Amino acid sequence: MKNTSKFQNVVIATIVGWLVLFVFLPNLMIIATSFLTRDDTDFVKLVFTLDNYSRLLDPLYFDVLLHSLNMALIATIACLVLGYPFAWFLARLPQKVRPLLLFLLIVPFWTNSLIRIYGLKIFLSTKGYLNEFLLWLGVIDTPVRIMFTPGAVIVGLVYILLPFMVMPLYSSIEKLDKPLLEAARDLGASKLQTFIRIIIPLTMPGIIAGCLLVMLPAMGLFYVSDLMGGAKNLLIGNVIKSQFLNIRDWPFGSATSITLTVVMGLMLLIYWRASRLLNKKVELE
């Protein structure tokens, strides 16, 4: 028992040390840097200021933040519209077939997402496979310009993040009480009524979880907008990357990072509150 207790203490200490060293301290440094002043020679000057946060209210950066939220919201809705039917179909398949499709859903995670975006870029380019196929069918006379548009960024985000929507939806749909659906049918409820009044409320935890898993990273995937959207379709992640790597304005980059983290934290808080309300509603019913 003593050896087991010592081993547990070592494991816990290792995990805590890892979190402190690679999560807590770096975030603390970013928070501290966000209140300092930029210096052209040493990157950071130890002079306290709030200008880095006030600059975020500048129309240039504020518009990028709103644009990021808008693009993330559209990508989330698209993932939900595409992911819900797929998750429903997956949950209704025979038990023997599901593992294969789940495996195919997870396989893309084995490949770096940046490589997959490069592949999608080639596929959607003016001389790519999609345009060549449409020209061969006679649907179009000249290649359609898809790349470097907001639509291309949305396609890229959906392509990368769709599995994150499907998995929690599949988990919620799989747990649906079939006798409850049969009872609704016996009582004369139509398929639409059953879907709206029973299925959606019961799968709402999966919907909320999937939306968060898609929307939170969607605002920061700077390489998707870089490769698919170009300079005119920036996300807030592009601003952060540019401030740290190109402009070398670390204080403002830190302030932008903290702001994005706070926005994500508020979304998580909304999810937590919504989950509690849903659980209370289910308990009352």
Language-model features: locations:
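N-terminal signal-anchor/first transmembrane alpha helix
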Residues: 1-30, 99, 103, 261
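Membrane-interfacial helix termini and adjacent extracytoplasmic/periplasmic loops
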Residues: 41, 50, 117-158, 192, ...
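Short membrane-interfacial helix/loop motifs at transmembrane-helix boundaries
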Residues: 24-61, 123, 127-128, 230, ...
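C-terminal transmembrane helix and the adjacent membrane-cytosol boundary/short C-terminal tail
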Residues: 2-6, 10, 36, 170-185, ...
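Non-cytoplasmic
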Residues: 26-33, 38-39, 115-117, 165-168, ...
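Interhelical loop and adjacent transmembrane-helix boundary motif
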Residues: 2-8, 53-60, 218, 226-273
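Transmembrane-helix boundary motif in ABC transporter permease subunits
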Residues: 1-4, 74-106, 122, 180-181, ...
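Transmembrane alpha-helices
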Residues: 15-24, 103, 107, 159, ...
